């Protein structure tokens, strides 16, 4: 198995980190809204595209996508994001690269996802989070199996 979690990708300078988990605190989301979340998501998927290119270049065949690709995604629908067309384009492109170069992409839900919780709100949040993960893989046009 080949794993891919290098500290820095490509030849970008230190002041331009390549990362897929740009996020924000709740107060920032409340004040700046979905527009800012959309901007951060677009930057995250652009950098995911860069990471996949880097992985292909160096022969890495596995990458785990962060759960924070779309900050505060539980608070809005994908279709409400101003940058959704570009986000979908990048995700589709990433899916094509992953299939073409046999890069396995996975994700891992957060530690608070407990489908068996006795608390209805915990289960609801878990289902929402898992749905968001599925939406990302759907936008990449990857199969509904654990073998992407």
How does the language model describe each region?
Residues 108:
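Conserved, mostly hydrophobic/aromatic
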Residues 1-103, 113-116, 121-124, 135-142:
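Alpha/beta catalytic barrel-like cores
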Residues 143-148:
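Short, intrinsically disordered, charge-balanced linker/junction segments flanking boundaries
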Residues 128, 132:
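Active-site glycine-rich loop that binds ribose-phosphate moieties when present
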């Amino acid at each position: 198995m080949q794993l891919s979690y290098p500290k820095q990708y490509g030849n970008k300078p230190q002041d331009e980190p390549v990362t897929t988990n740009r996020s924000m605190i709740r107060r920032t989301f409340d004040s700046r809204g979905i527009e800012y979340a959309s901007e951060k998501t677009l930057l995250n998927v652009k950098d995911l595209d860069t990471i996949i290119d880097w992985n292909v270049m160096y022969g890495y065949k596995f990458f785990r996508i962060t759960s924070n690709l779309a900050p505060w995604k539980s608070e809005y629908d994908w279709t409400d994001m101003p940058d959704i067309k570009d986000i979908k384009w990048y995700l589709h492109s990433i899916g094509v690269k992953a299939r073409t170069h046999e890069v396995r992409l996975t994700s891992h839900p957060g530690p608070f996802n407990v489908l068996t919780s006795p608390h209805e709100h915990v289960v609801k949040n878990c289902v929402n989070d898992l749905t968001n993960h599925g939406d990302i893989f759907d936008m990449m046009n990857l199969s509904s199996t654990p073998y992407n």
